């Protein structure tokens, strides 16, 4: 039986205090289950093989051992967290510097979008190309989306614990959802306009040498700048900056397609221009529809992968030897991070102070994980009861 903590002990309880240096035979230990170097060297099947259904016996074996390696690495990570009491990572100063860098990336992207939009407006007026106009309208939406993403980032940095007690991190996927919806709507409008042009009686498309030079020069310059912004923004892990990177990459594709459509329409036939615009529109709808689905899943509370739940269960069981059972381990998305619910069973005669300290330290330990925004640890003395929440499975 666990003895209650002495009254004169410190109020702040270390995450390491419960482990001590005594007997650890009660803990799960996978140190003896190491994958041989022979199997570590086996490469998992490529995505192409997986998609085509061309997995042979060797591919399945390699995939199995890859999963085992990842599982053992995950358990090792949990052991390091339990032993050190913290997750190795950036210091407060490094985090502040990273936040400043992310803000700078957003500002650079917004300024570049304004300048490039002005250049593409001139190219659209000069060429009259539907494909270039479609690309220019996309740049206009870049400015609008930039404002949306900036607003969500600003909202997240101004907490209000009374009106928003669990924070505003849901603003991030909501902003991306609005952005994606506007982009998909633009794509549909471009398709309708392109079809109208193809069915109209006006069937000519001609550019002078001077007009062609201006259009090609502007579009190539814009594409190069956007490509540099893609590489810059992809170096960050922040979801908003990554959304900018995706948008810049999309611009690179649309600029190239628009430029090719203009040149071919000028030298071959007029219909290539509206066809190029339709291709851009379909690409827009597909890209941002996938973005919508991804962010919807993050808001509706999709469960974490079984492999991640394994890691959490392992961490919970090894937290304290007084834990008799683990009743529930849940992790589900609530924005870009996980909410975690854990039910552990402790001895019925354990003093409240000791039980509280065990549960609180487990909660703090779980919240040290980068993917977890908030953890809830529920303490119980038995596990045969019905669910506490009347609508827990609705």
Curated annotation (Swiss-Prot):
Name of protein: Metal tolerance protein 11
Work out whether the entry's keyword set contains Acyltransferase: no
Cytoplasmic topological domain ranges are 1-103, 152-172, 234-251, 295-394
Mind telling me which GO cellular component terms the entry cites?
Golgi apparatus; Golgi membrane; late endosome
So which tissues is this one expressed in? Widely expressed.
Q: Which residues lie on this side of the membrane: Vacuolar?
A: 125-130, 194-212, 273
Q: Which SUPFAM superfamilies does the annotation name?
A: Cation efflux protein cytoplasmic domain-like, Cation efflux protein transmembrane domain-like
